[in-house]
Structure formats: structure tokens, C-alpha cells
């Protein structure tokens, strides 16, 4: 049922998001009605006032534990154990809810005052005075009654009617309301009116002996007893103290006495009998007589309170016979094995049974014990040699995970130390879904050693028993006993010398001279028991008379059938109808017939409409065939008519709600006719190849208007160009649920690429002659209607509407042949802070009869019309409130209208040229542009189209400021004062509203386990798609919700890499932080500037919040000049320090990494359940369990603790996780990019920036034939670089045909790459993947690209640019040696995450254009291109096969040089390369030196929208390139290896032996040569501190690295 409701709700939400406005309105109305019904249902719940003062967390606990009540938290009373005291009233009301209203009820030990206040005159309270505390409680209840009455008297009020009868009974016959006897001795004999009798017990069962309960209940003829009491499962174990943390209670046990009290409070203890309490928990049947028995049934556990009920059963119902009691002696003796007191009690309980012939078995109901087991822990005293044992509750999954894993250990590896290491590791961290690392099992650290010993003993004995089953022992000089104990002693050592004697005494083993018997102890014990009873009499089960209820139900059913003929009968309020019939004593059937007759106009009473809506009024007042024509007459002047047709005709309009459909259809047809000029227009005539070279002249406003017109043409050009390329490239289709494009094959009448949207307005058509044209499309059965000469049709999301076409047509028509002119109207900018009421001000100032309102979106337009017309007077319509697109697209279709004033809402989000056109075309005298200068401005999403920075400024005549926000809470207003000039104030009463939560990763986000409140917002489109794929609904980006208001907002960031739009000054942060009115919460996976901002707002003092006014202070960077030597000195670094220095430095730079126990991460990922989101792929599950390998080499253990991991083994799960992280879920950040034209422009920029002009002629640039690229020498150069085995594999290759070039193999690297950050503490690092071609393909293309690379590098300006290919550290130093430290420079680094899988079709187009200009053969280039478009990956080791589109393959011949070329081209397209001092590129790393003060574009935005890169631009003092710090000084530069990276490698866990260790040392010593020069250690400290903020001065550790790397013996001391 839940699934059906969820599916219906999802379908309804999909309908709301549709494009049919009428269906949308109906769906929204349905959602609204559903919400109202839910709230009404919740309002009907019983209301409880919770006056005790508790915190927010406790408030949430109470609300979730008792959803049956509508609880109001007043927090007006401070009291001891406030939560427990407040819960007592809720527990009482919950128990009384189970009792039928008005039935005689006995409250055992109850609160008679509470029942009086509720008016329950049918409750009798047994309140015995067992001690002085009971007397005091009784007196307190009397005082509460007296206080209540005196308060009423002081206010001259009388008792409410519902309380009078109860108080009257208490006044006249108090013995019927309360008595001082125990329930067993209660003398009350109130008459029950023939109904059933009930009883409740709220925390009073402890004082009633369990053996007397049944008889006492039967004496009062109680049918059901509902009880509540505190209990903890741990009390069944041998523990002396148990805590109830939620309510703060403590159970303490001493023998049979159990005490209950509250921690940290001076209240008295409550003492009870432990054995009596145990009976209530463990027993199921409580005998009352030889016939009746009360059966206990647990109901639920809420906030440490157990609820149960005892129901009276007649045993004669089952069998005829007599009740008897007997003793099962065997059960008694077996239960008495241990001599503890509580075991005696349980033995007595198990021996005394009621026997049932059906042998029914019942398990105890322990909610906390689900999947929990009791594990024994053993210990031995070294002095007395006495064995001790205790029990603990542990997760069953934890026990089996440990036992199953250590059972795979070989005999030498099965030691106590290894078992303890694994137990400690998986207790601290478990890998969840191959992504997140967190603690999964809550096991006390103090028990780990004892539990490890238990697991070790169990496994050791199990292995010995298995060996005995396989074969018998062969006697030798040693006895069999000695062989076994030698085996155990090798694992245990000398830790437990009396272990053998302890096991013999326990009888776990027994032996003789010739044989050995081993009994493996139970791994754990579960909670269970069996109950058997026997009955021999049989009677009929008593029945309840429900004939009256059935009769009433039948009459209402008949009435409902009568009402079902009504329109919208599903919305008929049956509850109100039933209440009306009950109050007026009316037969429901008769009432239903009257209602149907009235609503069907058959009763003589006419209802013209059901609701006073415009549509129903028009329907009721419209003329019929025989009615006279109704005219307005003299009343026309007094009626506000906005339709010109109404004024002309003078007759009542005949348009209702449905008339909008025909109107919309008419407008669309007219639009198509006006756009016929585009139909069958050649695509080449629309595509512009010179977007980037447009020159504008004239005043700035005229230039902006020209730029806006050109941007529309550029957008249309880019869309047409991409569709043209798509229709030509598509040969084989693919099905993608998120495809934004579509290609239709006319001959096959099928979609080769099926788009997500339907009914596109236009597209690009390819005819059979290969030419492409634009076409306006029509559809039949969701398929386009095509001409006979059409071959294919390409569409995309940009071709859904005629927006750009229509706007471009209107603007060009309005311009004509005359130069563009600017309107003389006065333009006023209303600059308001978020939530200042800009829309409200527009509605207040506008005169809809002569003014025009324009808004960006149709939702905003509908909202303005609704608010303007809410009084019932229709003043706003489609003529005076429009969207900007609608105004521009439909201009000129009707008579020319001149408006007096123009109001543009959110005008700063528009292109400034668009605003000037709106002012000009509206013919207004004055224009008001409402916006926010600090929020998100206009963003140019057409890449390679010029939009200079100065074009973004809107030129106005006057600026008005609004600095009072009506929406933002006070703490957010404090932040606004830092962003705006002038004092920002607020009218909101909400003081504190912001909060944050750092989540463990994207895998944590799930709408079931982690529901988010309010509106869900993200910064990026990729995070939005991730949230939608996770199951969240109604997710938007910050840019999409600008201008909207929500009560609660949940802002989510799932991208761990830096995002340029998240900074304290970012307008995106400002928009995201100012959308809420009550509550804002930020969920992030990393600590970013917004986290710092939210924490600062949480710490603002109340004094500042009361003033809500802060002066803005501009922060200035303190500049300190460095001290440099006059020349590049070499000072030999002394060799000093020890291993502790290396460990200290590592822990300061990366705190916490050295404490991570990640040795068994791969094991826990394979052992635990996993849920992965994968693309379409084929999995061979026969490869899921790899064959075990006997690895005799044990790796050496490093002395230095780092985050290094052990090598991992390949397998289905490990390889699949690596493939998901490295190849799947590629980002989709790019905007609209004209692939071919933009790639050509980028290639031009690449060659102009990096190549020497005089060497261009020396390479093959422009030689498209590529005939001179490959010769014998080029082939020999390539073969010299290959291994002999590679050349040998090519010996049998005939080179007649090519293998499948789109087929790749996939493997993983066994050693994870270390990250120099803290991510290892919460993440599971994925392995690096290698995707490679066969050797045969590499033999053909390897020499080609090797020669192309050689020629390209030979023509590059090596004095300014370094392409890091096969360069030594000395050559890097030489390249940077001419840097001048006296020249102010900016050091830029572009950090790109997910570099390989972010590369899409555009990157391929850029790379192929560069190779083409370098002279590659066209045929081979096309072959290579097709091999990188749609590729198939096969992992034979793991059994995985999948398909990928584009992406950079990590193992083909162009991986390194291709990545280097792409990052260089990316930087060339964004930076002024003609000003660059130095630049270096290597793979995805880049380092650029620019003069100080250069104007830079928005690098991050361009990298996102054009290059699809999640990039972050860093500006530093010193460069960091390929794991090395570039330290420049006054006359040169020195390149230091990253010392932290060297220390991290010293914690390697893959070193097998000393020979391997020596090779490792030599490798590290080679890359660390520069550390021998200590002359520039001070500058190196500054460079390291730029990257790692917590790094201390490190000269001592640099010297220590030199010391250990230079000496073989010292280096060997770092491993053992």
C-alpha cells in the first residue's frame, strides 16, 4: 500500500511539472486538498500540554515517540527529571486511549487528580500508602485539586461541564473515586453497567507480586489490564548497574533488590524485588483460577518504557480438562548449572509451566536485542589460577564478520595479536558502499582484548576439530596432547599460563593418552524460551453485540452510494455529513437524497455555482438559446473592463476558464505563420563562424543592445551548429534517460536517439543529398511529420520553443535599416536587499490600466496576477502583466499599445541590452527596474561569444535603495550589513535561523534515512542531478530560485572539490542564504567558506542581533616583503633528527591521519552489504569470489604511521567501485557550446599562444595529408622506447586489418594513491584505473602520435612555456631560473577534479583540431576519433563490461600528451597568454606566472560552462607543480620536492623485503636531491604553509629526510 501511495504521489508531482497549465492547476489543487486533509486529520488528535522544560533534542524524541497526540511544548516548568515527569502524563493518556470510553476502569496506584481534570468519572484509583512517599504523593494530588478549584474561584469561574460529574462524585462519594487499599484488597464495588471492566497500571506493577496479579484481576472481573513499566534488557545479564540514557534513569541491583533513581539528582530511590520484576518480563501466562488465565502481550517500547497488556482467557475454549502444575526436573537441574542468584530465579521460572498440548513456542520481545547476541568473555587470575567469566551484548553481524574473516587465516597468521588488530580495525571504521568510512558497531573499547581472546579460542578449537574430522593424529615422540597444546601456545604465548587447566575444568576439552576430544563452545546465546500448556475443557468463545454498529454502517454505505452520482464526489466531506446527521437525528439515506436533488437542480432550489470562481460565475450567467441578449447599458462606465473587445461590443464577455485553450492555440498558430521565414532555411546561413570577432561602436547602451541581438543569434547559431553536427554524426543510436538531444530516422520511423522531451517546435533536417535545413515541425502520434526528401531530423532541449527565433525576428524588425537608438524615458533602478518587498512595491505603485509589468518567468507573472486580483476585481491580465519573452515574441501581433510606466522585476538578471529594448519597445515615459546589485547577475551561457565585463553594467538615470528586508531573519541581516553599503534592517521576528551539518559523503544522502526540511537547493547542476537520482523531490539550484521565498531551506553541497561560486563574497552564497524566513540548514561534505560564515552567524551576540546593524569593514592583506640572498647559494643540509621528528611533522600537517586503522578496509567492504549506483553494464558474478592465493611474503611494517594502505587485490567489487568513481557519473556542467566553431577558435588561440612563429613552418601545420609524418626514423625512435616483450607481441601481426579500435581493456592499480588531505578519515580511496588498447593498435598509432608530439614540442616557445614531458628536476629548475622576484607576480594554479572523465565531445573536438593542424592523416584521424567516441570497456579479471561516451582513456597512447594539450588549450582560452611570464603544463597540472594586476575573466565559470571542469583557481605566493614547490628568488629558482609526500611514502605497507626496500630508498633519494640545499628552507616553509595551514617550521624534518635517505642502514631502521 505504501508503494502504491508513493507511486501515485510521484505521478502527481510529475503532472505538476508538466507543460499543460490546466492539468497543472488541477494537480496543484489536488496536492493542496491532500495537505489540508492531512493537517485536519492531525488536528483531530488528542491535545496534550507539555509544560516541563526540555531541550530541542528531547522535544523531538517526545514528538516521535507519541504521534497519536498533538503535543504543545510550553517549557514553563523547571523540574527534576523533567523529561520523565512530562512523559508520565503522556503514558497515562496513551494507556487510557486503549480503554473504551466510559468503561469502568481501575487505575492501580494511579493519579486520581489527573482523571478528575479530564472528567473521567468512570475511573477508580487504588492508591495504597505503602510508605511515607505514597502518603506525600497522595497529599500532593489533593493539593493540586484544591489549587485548581481556588484558581477558578478567584477568577469567578465555575467548573467546566465535562468535569462537573467527576468532581461531584469525588465530593459526595470519594471512596468510588479513590481508595487507600492495594488493588488485591480493593473493596470498591462500582457497577460496570454490564460492560467490560478494564484496568491500567502506570509504573505500579513492581509492587504487586506476580503470583497474585491474576487472582486480583479476576476478583474485579477485569477483562484487560494495560500496563507500563521501566526495564532494560541488560538487567538479564550479570551486571550491577544499567543506565537508561534517554530519560536519565539508572537501575542498580544488589541481590534480589533492585533500585531505580535518576542520575545527577537528589531524588529518592525506588526499591523493588528483582525476581518479581523478572517474572513480569519473562512469564507469559498469569493463572487466575483453574479455568481463567491472563496472557501477557508486549505492545511497544517508547522512551525506555515498556507497554504491555494482560488479557483474560478462558482455557475451556481449547480443551476439556483441569489445570495442574508440575515440575520438569531435568529442566531444573540443567538450569542450575551456574550458581548465580538470578540463574536460580530463572530456573524456578523455567521449571514451573502451564502445559499446552499444541506445543506453541513464544520468543521474548526485546526490541533492543534485534540482531544482538550474548558473547562470553573469559579471564584467568595469574595468582589464584581461577577462571572468571562474564557476558556482554554484541551485534551478531559483528561476531560473524570477525569469525568468518579470521577463520581464513593460515595457521601461522592465526595469532592473538592478529585477531586483536582486526577486531580493533573494523570496530573503528567500516567501508559503506565503497565510498564512506565510518564506525558501524558500537562496541566498548575496554572489551576488545577480552572479545579478541574469545574469538581466538573459538577459532583455534574449531580448526583443531576440523583437522580431527579429516584425519587422525599420528603418535610420535610427543603425545597427541602435546602436539595440540604446542599449537595453541604458539598463538597465545605466555599470556595465559593456566589456559589448559581452565579449559579442562570447564570441560571444553577432555583427553586421554591415545585420543583427544574437542568440544567447541557456543559462540553466543540468544534470548528465547518455550511455553507449553494443556487444557481439556471446551466452551464457545464469547461474542460482542455489534448489530447496532452494523446497521448504522449499512445506512451510511447506502447514503454514500447515493452521493456517488455527484460531480467531484471523491472530495465530498463524509465526516461533516455524518456529524450533521448525528446532530440533527436525520436518516443518512434521506439526507443524501435531498443533497443530490438540491445540487442537481431538481428540488426547486437553484445553485448557480458551487464556488464563487470566475469560471462558475460565467457559466451561471451566460446566455442560453432562448435568453435575451444581455448588454451592459449604463453600467459600463462603472465596470472595470480590461478587454478591448468588451469595450467595443458593450456585451458581457463569453470567455471562461476553458477559453484560454483556444486563445493559446490561436497565438501559437499565428506565431508559426510569422516564423515561416525560418522554415527550410539553410543551416549554414544561420551558423556564424565569427562570433568572437564582433566589433561594436557607438554609445555604451547602443553597444549593449547590439550585443544582446547578437547573443540571440549566437545562441541560435550554436544550437543549429550542434544539431547539424549531431544529425551527421549519429549512425547508431543509444538510449539515455537523461538525453537532451534526439535524432529521428525518417526511413525507419524511429528515434535513433530518443529525447526526454516531446513535441519540439523546430529542428535541423538533413536531406538525402546531405544538406541541412531548419524546419518548423508538426507531429502525429508523437512522431514528426516529414517530407519525402528528409533523411533525419535532429532536435534538442533548446528547440522546444521558438523563443530565440521569435525574439530575434521582432528585434530585427524593430531595428530595421536605421541605427539602434535608445529610448529617452527615465530609467530608475530600485536596488533592494533580499526580501525587501520589491514585488509588493510594484503592486502598490502600478496602475494596471496604463502601466506594464514584465517579469523573467511565467510563474512570477502568474503570482503577480493572482496577488493583484485577489480582491475579486480583475485588474491584472495577460496584456499588462507579461514575461519578458512573451512581450518580445508577441510584439506587433496586435494594435500598438503605449504604456505610461514600465516595471521590470528582477531586471538585473537580464542582459542590459534587453532592458533597454524593453524600455524602448514599450513606448513608456518612465521605467523602474527592480533588482539586487549583490545577487546573481546576468550570465552569458553562450560560450565563445563576447560579453565584455563593462557590458554587464546597467546605465540608469537614478538609483533608489531599499535597505529594509521583510523576509530575512536577524542573523542573516547581520551578514547583509557586510555585503551592502548602508545599514540593513529587518522586520522579521526570527532571531536565529541558520545551522549546518557536515555529512560523510554523497552516499549518506537518502530521503528515507535523511529527510530534508523545506526547499532543497544546490549550488551546481551536478549536485542537483545527484539529489534527484537519490530520490529527493523538487530540487533546484541557487540560480533557479533567485527571487523566491520559502519558510525552510536545506542547502546541499555534495561536491568535495573546490567550487568557485562558494565564497563569502559570492552572489550565489548571498542568494542561497536569503531565501528562508524561518530556518536554513547547510549540508556539506567539506569545510568551505560558507561553513565558516554559518558558524560566525551562530556566534553573533544577542546584543548585535537586537541592533541588527553592522558597519562594513574592508579586510586588507598585510604585505611582508621577503628576504632573499643576492645569489642562488648552495648550503649543504646537515643530517640530523630521528623518526619521531618525521611522525611529529606528519601529525601536525595532517592531524588524525596516522590514527586511521585502514588495514582491513578492503576486507570490510567485501564482507558488508553494499549498494551501488551504476550505469548499464554486464557483470559476471562468477568472478565475484577470487580464488585464494597463498602469499608467503609478509610485507614489512613501517615505523612511521601514515594513511598509506595495503595493496588491494583485484576482484569484481573492488574493480567495480573503482570504475564507478573513475569512469561513471561524469559531470555535466557545460553550457551551450558550438562544438566545431569554438574548437576552431580554441585551436587558433593554442597555436598563437604557445608556438614560435618562425618554427611553425618547420612542422606539418596545414599539411592535412600527413604524408611526411611517419618515416623509418620515427618508427625506430618509437621502438627504442618500447620493451622487448612488447616488440615480441607484434611479431605475428600481419597489419592487414585493424583490431576493433573502440574496444578497451580495464584493470586497476593495486596500490591506492595517497592524498595529502584528511579525506582518508571518512572516505574509502578508490583505486586508479588503467583503460588501454591492445599492443597492435599501439604499434600503429604510437609512432604517429609520438612524432606529432616531437614536432609540436620542437615548435613551442620553450623560454616561456614548459610542457613537462620526460623532464628531470634539474631541467625544471633551469626553466624557472630566470624568474625575477623583484617583479610583482601572480602565481596561478588551476586545480581540476575528475579531469579524465569530465572530458566530453568538446574536448575531443579541440584535440582533433590540433592534431589535424599538426598534419595527421585524415583517415587515421577519423579512425582514432571513432575509437574514442563510443567505447566498450572489458575487465576480464573482474568480469565487467560497460560502454562509455568520450572521456579520457588512462592507458592509450595520447593519455599524457593529450591531457597536457587540453589543459594548455583550456588556459589559453581563458587567460591573456601574451602577458604570461612563465607557464608549465603537465597532465592535469598547470602553473602560470602573470604580472600583478592583470584583469582576469571569471576563470571558474568559464571552466565550468565551456570546458565542463569542476575547477578551482588558486592564487599563491609560490608555485606547486607536479608534487614540487617552485621557490623563486631574486636571481633564480629552486624546485623542492614536497616533503610531506616523502614522509607519506615512508609509511608504505607494500615493501616485501630488504632488497625491495633498498630500491625504494634509491628512488626516494633521487627525487629528493634538492633537499640537500638548505639555503631556501625558510621560503619552503612559507610555501608548505600555503597548502597546509597547520604545518610548523620544517627545517628540522627536511634535514631528517636527508639523513635517512642518504644512509641505507638508517633507512632500514624505519621498517621491521
Curated annotation (Swiss-Prot):
Note: This protein is translated as a fusion protein by episodic readthrough of a termination codon. When readthrough of the terminator codon TGA occurs between the codons for Ala-1115 and Gln-1117, this results in the addition of the RdRp region to the replicase.
Residue span(s) of domain Alphavirus-like MT: 72-281
Protein family membership: Belongs to the ssRNA positive-strand viruses RNA-directed RNA polymerase family.
Gene3D superfamilies: 3.30.450.420, P-loop containing nucleotide triphosphate hydrolases
Biological source species: Tobamovirus Ob
Assembly behavior: Heterodimer of a large and a small subunit.
Ligand binding (ATP): 832-839
SUPFAM superfamilies (alphabetical): DNA/RNA polymerases, P-loop containing nucleoside triphosphate hydrolases
Sequence ranges assigned to domain RdRp catalytic in this UniProt record: 1385-1498
Known catalytic reactions: RNA(n) + a ribonucleoside 5'-triphosphate = RNA(n+1) + diphosphate; ATP + H2O = ADP + phosphate + H(+)
Entry's EC annotation: 2.1.1.-, 2.7.7.-, 2.7.7.48, 3.6.4.13
Region (Methyltransferase): 50-466
(+)RNA virus helicase ATP-binding domain mapped to chain residues: 800-962
GO molecular function: ATP binding; ATP hydrolysis activity; mRNA methyltransferase activity; RNA binding; RNA helicase activity; RNA-directed RNA polymerase activity
The (+)RNA virus helicase C-terminal domain, residue ranges: 963-1115
UniProt protein name: Replicase large subunit
Region (Helicase): 828-1084
Keywords, in A-Z order: ATP-binding, Helicase, Host-virus interaction, Hydrolase, Inhibition of host innate immune response by virus, Nucleotide-binding, Nucleotidyltransferase, RNA suppression of termination, RNA-directed RNA polymerase, Suppressor of RNA silencing, Transferase, Viral immunoevasion, Viral RNA replication
Source species, domain of life: Viruses
